[in-house]
């Protein structure tokens, strides 16, 4: 589990470097015009996610944040690089087989989704209100953690719950003598959605609300969810 946590922290640190670099490069550019026609765009928001099947069979909801930065070709066309993190809360159904195997109810777990994406955004912007569509793709890494290590026996039937936690099945049975406390899977995926903006301050701060569908073919269980993001754009 320590290795998984170290890997997750490393991924977050790399994401920080990726999105901090554009700010460092522009830090000394005092002549940059940061009005409505600025070439730089940034965003930071809180995301509450609704999982879709098959992910919804294993998680109730997700919450986290989204941060991004990019380049505006014009007032309508832009590219945006984003990092999304969501903490995934497991359902009771996905915990039950693990609790039965350990003969205790004192077992919990959680998952994390990390996504690095490059996106195209088309926006129609008025003086106060705006709307946009956004779509792109990138790399999605998802993991799952148990609060206790689990060693499988020889009579456990394979159900989606075992697959969610990373166990391997064979001929309808969970393969015996596996010991796991965490697992992870990475895959390239796509996303698409739309949002609305409201100008809230000068020079060009905008409050935004966005819904976006994300899909990635992670091993054992595909990642499909819709984060509803509320935040500030600049």
Map each language-model feature to its residues:
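Residues on the lipid-exposed face of transmembrane beta-strands in outer-membrane beta-barrel proteins
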Residues: 44-48, 65-71, 118-122, 135-139, ...
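Extracellular loop and loop/strand-boundary signature of outer-membrane beta-barrel proteins
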Residues: 51-55, 101-108, 176-182, 214-218
């Amino acid at each position: 589990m320590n290795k998984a946590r170290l890997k997750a922290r490393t991924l977050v640190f790399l994401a920080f470097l990726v999105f901090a670099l554009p700010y460092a490069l522009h830090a000394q550019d005092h002549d940059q015009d940061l009005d409505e026609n600025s070439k730089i765009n940034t965003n930071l928001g809180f995301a509450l996610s609704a999982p879709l099947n098959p992910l919804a069979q294993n998680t109730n909801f997700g919450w986290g944040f989204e941060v991004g930065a990019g380049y505006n070709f014009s007032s309508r066309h832009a590219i945006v690089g984003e990092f999304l993190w969501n903490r995934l809360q497991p359902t009771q159904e996905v915990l039950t087989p693990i609790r039965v195997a350990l003969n205790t109810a004192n077992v919990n777990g959680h998952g994390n989704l990390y996504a690095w994406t490059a996106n195209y955004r088309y926006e129609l912007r008025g003086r106060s209100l705006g709307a946009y569509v956004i779509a792109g793709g990138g790399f999605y890494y998802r993991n799952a953690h148990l609060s206790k290590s689990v060693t499988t026996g020889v009579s456990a039937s394979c159900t989606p719950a075992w697959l969610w936690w990373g166990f391997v099945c064979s001929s309808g049975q969970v393969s015996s003598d596996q010991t796991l406390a965490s697992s992870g899977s990475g895959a390239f995926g796509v996303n698409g959605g739309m949002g609305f903006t409201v100008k809230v301050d000068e020079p060009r701060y905008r409050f935004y609300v966005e819904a976006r569908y994300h899909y990635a073919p992670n091993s054992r269980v595909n990642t499909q969810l819709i984060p509803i993001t509320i935040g500030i754009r600049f």
